[in-house]
Amino acid sequence: MSKNGGEMIVKQETLKLPLKDADKVIAHIVNGIRTSFESIFTRTTAGGLKGLKKGANASMPFIFEKEGMKIALVESDWTEYPGLRIHYPKDADSPRALFAPVPKKLVQKGNQLQPSEVEDYIAKTSGTREFPWRAFIVARDDKVLADNDTVYKLASESKIGDASWITPGSSVWDWWVNWNTKGVDFKCGFNEQMCKYYVDFAADNDIPYITLDAGWHVGR
């Protein structure tokens, strides 16, 4: 926690994991900072991370074995701050933390805004704030990790006063059908007519939700 007041610039965080190259890890490996977090978790070794192509890293949770124990590195209560990643630079002796720098200039690429220039720091934030939790969950086998609620317990309380109206249910999903349909009198695509059509379709078929996927903020 920081109580300095005003605005604060965080240059970097340091975290070095005490792993040997032969230690087993389970990692969600992605290529670069920008990712949709949809990769398959990979069973490899700490040394295997060193052989990945430049820019590759692992997002949380990062799981490794040490002295017969299963250990999951996780984070919680993460707001206005870059998420923790793990990478293994070729000139390093063990895996360590990696954080996305703050974008300095953004450019439009397709339906995304991507940084073309970055700052030399990872966060510009309030000087009075709590920082994200970094935690190690230790277990004797994998199923204990799956049943652990450390991330939930470390998180801030819900900002929603009454969440009883939030319930699971089916949804019409525009991206899954590639913004497409048949028998309509307008051009299919990510446009207002298509969104209205999906809303009407959901209502007519008692589907409680509609999902507006990637590109909604700038158009497809």
Residue ranges and their predicted role:
Residues 1-158:
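N-terminal accessory beta-strand-rich subdomains and adjacent acidic, glycine-rich linkers
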Residues 162:
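Conserved catalytic cores of very large enzyme subunits
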Residues 167:
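Phosphate/adenylate-binding glycine loop and adjacent helical scaffold
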Residues 172-220:
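Aromatic-lined carbohydrate-binding/catalytic grooves of carbohydrate-active enzymes
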